[in-house]
Regions:
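Hydrophobic, aromatic-enriched interface-forming segments
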Residues: 142-149
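GST superfamily/GST-like fold recognition
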Residues: 162, 167-170
């Protein structure tokens, strides 16, 4: 089984992006999964095209996109991507779309097709703070998550996909006055667990992961 795992380049003034650091440390094989990786630009205009090209080259059964969400305290598997671009800051092309769709006339939302609750349960068993998140935001992370699931719907090879938001790493938090962070090794282990679980499960567990807010 082949998996494609992507990370983003640094953005917003950061010198590193932990998603790219973590993806770069993944083993080439995790259990029965052959792992391929790709770097995506933090760009509304170009990220989906780079992702599509990587998918066409690799032809993966599993795609996991990973992105930084500074301020989060857990490894957050996203449940849903929405068809909205509403940028708080400019992307790396200097663009700041407001209230624009990811895909014109596309559905309002796409849901992850990885077993996100089962993955979260296994990460917690491994001692990693993890959660199902119900909002991927409206920046490039949500954009690429929506684009991924849109591609998956029409892809000739069956393909499941999802998005993982990760906290800062300690070197970033040290410059930001005590922002929450997570060790890079723990982030890498979380990604490995997601791939392991996704390779062995096609259905999710029926457990409560809802939140009031």
């Amino acid at each position: 089984m082949k998996a494609l795992v992507t990370g983003f380049d640094p953005f917003g003034g950061d010198k590193v992006n932990p998603s790219l650091l973590a993806v770069g440390q993944l083993k080439k094989r995790i259990g029965e999964v052959v792992v391929h990786t790709a770097q995506l630009p933090t760009s509304y205009a170009h990220s989906a095209g780079v992702l599509r090209a990587a998918i066409e080259e690799v032809k993966p059964e599993i795609v996991l996109c990973v992105g930084q969400a500074g301020g989060r305290t857990e490894l957050c598997l996203e449940r849903v991507a929405i068809n909205v671009q509403d940028a708080r800051i400019r992307d790396n092309d200097g663009k700041q779309p407001i209230d624009k769709p990811v895909v014109k006339d596309g559905p309002a939302a796409h849901f992850a097709t990885l077993p996100i609750k089962a993955c979260v349960a296994e990460m917690r068993k491994a001692g990693l703070p993890a959660a199902v998140s119900n909002s991927a935001g409206t920046f490039v992370c949500n954009h690429i998550f929506y684009a991924l699931m849109d591609i998956a719907q029409s892809h000739p090879i069956p393909m499941r996909g999802g998005f993982l938001h990760i906290p800062y790493v300690p070197e970033q938090a040290a410059r930001l006055g005590g922002a929450p962070s997570m060790a890079l090794d723990d982030i890498v282990r979380g990604i490995e667990i997601i791939l392991e679980v996704s390779a062995t499960r096609t259905s999710d567990v029926h457990t409560v992961e809802g939140r009031i807010s």
